[in-house]
Amino acid sequence: MKLVQFFEIGQQLLKTKDFVEKNKNTTVVTLSYEKLLTLQNSTGGDNLQVTATLPNPSPEIFKKMIAIVSNLRKEENGFFATNQMGTSSNRAKSTDTPAVSTSQNVGGANEPKTILISKFLNKFILLLPFFKNSLQTLSDRLVQQEKMLKELNSTFTKITESQKSLKQLYKKTISQYAVVSSKFIVQQNNFKKFQKNLKQFASEQRLLKFLPKLRYLPTSQTKMYEIVELFMKKFVDPKLSYPMEQIYDQKLKFTSKKIAATRKQKWQRLEKYFGGITKMAKMNTKQISKNVAIIIGQQEEMNAVHECRKLGMKIFAVVDTNCNPKFVDHIIPANDDSRNSIKYILGEMLTYIRLGQKLRKKVSLRAKIQQNRKKRFAY
């Protein structure tokens, strides 16, 4: 808008200049405002008569004009062949005073007239081609920017459409995945139930093979019960565990109370001291070597120490001055005769053993969860 206004001002100035130059009796002279004042003072103002005045534009537009001219002078040195001090004084005065065009009438009406124009306005006319070119470039840029905006709008609409389609696809895939995962979980549970039923059916078939043979055996009910229990342990459920008191009562049913009580006491005592050996018989050497033995009183328990060394079990022992530390893997130097020291050591060890067992359970649960996740993603 500024360039358009300046271009219109320059065109109006050109028209006035051309109109004045067409008249043969008039001549145009460009002067600065200071020279015009000195000329009036020197002649006394008698011969110089002001017939017409050409007012300057508004102060705001005039300041903008001055700023454009000063910028152009910085960019193109030598474009204006005027003195810097003269132009600055002219600009300062021109903002406050109008540009005066005068006609000098010394003789009659047919004598030639001179018209004085401000030097700044005369030089501002030279900027018309620059304004024209700049307006053309600005219009070209606007056209290019409009094209770019149209292209950007088209690409933006395409992106939004593709984004909507992708969102719909994502929702569909999530819904399908949820349906598939639910079906998979149901089928997995059904498969586990089917496996359990198959195992039970196989174990029942194994048991039924031996039942016809038991029919013809001349045995009592107690013996039959024991044989069926043995078959149940070996073929149906090997992990089945029975309380020992129930077994004692079944075997001592038909004996007197006195004999039953004495035998039961003997069996309980034997179970107390040698019950762990039965479980050790079912374990491998690797499983035994993973266990740990805590021994207090090495001299009294040398047999246990030798057995642990044969089986490869690690030994934690409270070692006193009368003990041999060579037979021990992990030494705990303390008094093995005092009750308080033994109680403190065993209490601390128990707390950390239980903590380790809890941590092992948590780690095993996490490992199972990760395996289940891997299996799901594999399918």
From Swiss-Prot:
Q: Which molecular-function annotation in GO is an example for this chain?
A: structural constituent of ribosome
Q: Which InterPro entries match?
A: Ribosomal_uS2 (IPR001865), Ribosomal_uS2_bac/mit/plastid (IPR005706), Ribosomal_uS2_flav_dom_sf (IPR023591)
Stretches the record annotates as N-terminal extension: 1-94
Q: Name one GO cellular component term.
A: chloroplast
Keyword terms, alphabetized: Chloroplast, Plastid, Ribonucleoprotein, Ribosomal protein
Q: Tell me the compartments it is located in.
A: Plastid, Chloroplast
| Disordered: region residues | 83-106
Which Pfam families does this one have?
Answer: Ribosomal_S2 (PF00318)
Picking any one GO biological process from the record gives: translation
Q: Which NCBIfam families match?
A: rpsB_bact
**Family as reported in the entry's similarity comment:** Belongs to the universal ribosomal protein uS2 family.
What name does this protein carry?
Small ribosomal subunit protein uS2cy
The root-end lineage is:
Eukaryota, Viridiplantae, Chlorophyta, core chlorophytes, Chlorophyceae
